[in-house]
From Swiss-Prot:
Location, primary (coarse class): membrane
Residue stretches spanning the membrane: 60-79, 98-117, 131-150, 180-199
Purpose: High affinity receptor that binds to the Fc region of immunoglobulins epsilon. Aggregation of FCER1 by multivalent antigens is required for the full mast cell response, including the release of preformed mediators (such as histamine) by degranulation and de novo production of lipid mediators and cytokines. Also mediates the secretion of important lymphokines. Binding of allergen to receptor-bound IgE leads to cell activation and the release of mediators responsible for the manifestations of allergy.
Extracellular side: 80-97, 151-179
GO biological process: cell surface receptor signaling pathway; immune response; positive regulation of mast cell degranulation; regulation of release of sequestered calcium ion into cytosol; signal transduction
InterPro entries the UniProt entry points to: CD20-like (IPR007237), MS4A (IPR030417)
Modified residues (Phosphoserine): S225
Modification after translation: Phosphorylated on tyrosine residues by LYN.
Subcellular location: Membrane
Topological region Cytoplasmic: 1-59, 118-130, 200-243
Family that this chain belongs to: Belongs to the MS4A family.
Residues with the Phosphotyrosine modification: Y218, Y224, Y228
Protein name as catalogued: High affinity immunoglobulin epsilon receptor subunit beta
Length: 243
């Protein structure tokens, strides 16, 4: 009986007023989320200007001039070697009497070559040589356009006469020369536009080159003035005090 009472005493019922013991739970303070740094606004893309556009197309414009010059030279050589120019009127072959396919072609090739070289090696003498060559090339192209238009007007009058003639070698040659003049007129206008665009770019480049030294001078003054003042301060601080 004593053992039974002792075991019942050990099995005491829990007191409902006492709170049940629970393991201590450590509460970690949650750190506040880090504030996101404000993102810098993206820099706007650089504005596309005529200068930046032409700078990308310099070599293309130079190659265009070289090709136009070579085509004009080929046409002039083929026509003069296959046709007896003395058998035709001067008005029909005004283009070749003036020698435009030859001197015009040489000027186009020269200006195109200098434009390509000045784009690859941006030296002062090449840039200014390219500018001068393109000015001469644009003048030559303008004269060539005038000669070609005059040649077309003369050929059109001769072609009206050839409408009533079915078989005539002179009319056939005149028709061929007219088509050739039209093709050369298109190529000459293309060379003229290329030369004018290159002149515009080179003149703008010369203006920028003349402005750069003044800007650099002001930048150097702004950059080096605090450096000089800092050096003066350090010299004064490190100077020994003479008693």
């Amino acid at each position: 009986m004593d053992t039974e009472n002792k075991s019942r005493a050990d099995l005491a019922l829990p007191n409902p007023q006492e709170s049940p013991s629970a393991p201590d739970i450590e509460l970690l303070e949650a750190s506040p989320p880090a504030k996101a740094l404000p993102e810098k606004p993206a820099s706007p893309p650089p504005q596309q200007t005529w200068q930046s556009f032409l700078k990308k197309e310099l070599e293309f414009l130079g190659v265009t001039q070289v090709l136009v010059g070579l085509i004009c030279l080929c046409f002039g050589t083929v026509v003069c070697s296959t046709l007896q120019t003395s058998d035709f009127d001067d008005e029909v072959l005004l283009l070749y009497r003036a020698g435009y396919p030859f001197w015009g072609a040489v000027l186009f090739v020269l200006s195109g070559f200098l434009s390509i070289m000045s784009e690859r090696k941006n030296t002062l003498y090449l840039v200014r040589g390219s500018l001068g060559a393109n000015i001469v090339s644009s003048i030559a192209a303008g004269l060539g356009i005038a000669i070609l238009i005059l040649n077309l007007s003369n050929n059109s009058a001769y072609m009206n006469y050839c409408k009533d003639i079915t078989e005539d070698d002179g009319c056939f040659v005149t028709s061929f020369i007219t088509e050739l003049v039209l093709m050369l007129l298109f190529l000459t206008i293309l060379a003229f536009c290329s030369a004018v665009l290159l002149i515009i770019y080179r003149i703008g480049q010369e203006f920028e080159r003349s402005k750069v030294p003044d800007d650099r001078l002001y930048e150097e003054l702004h950059v080096y003035s605090p450096i000089y003042s800092a050096l003066e301060d350090t010299r004064e601080a490190s100077a020994p005090v003479v008693s």
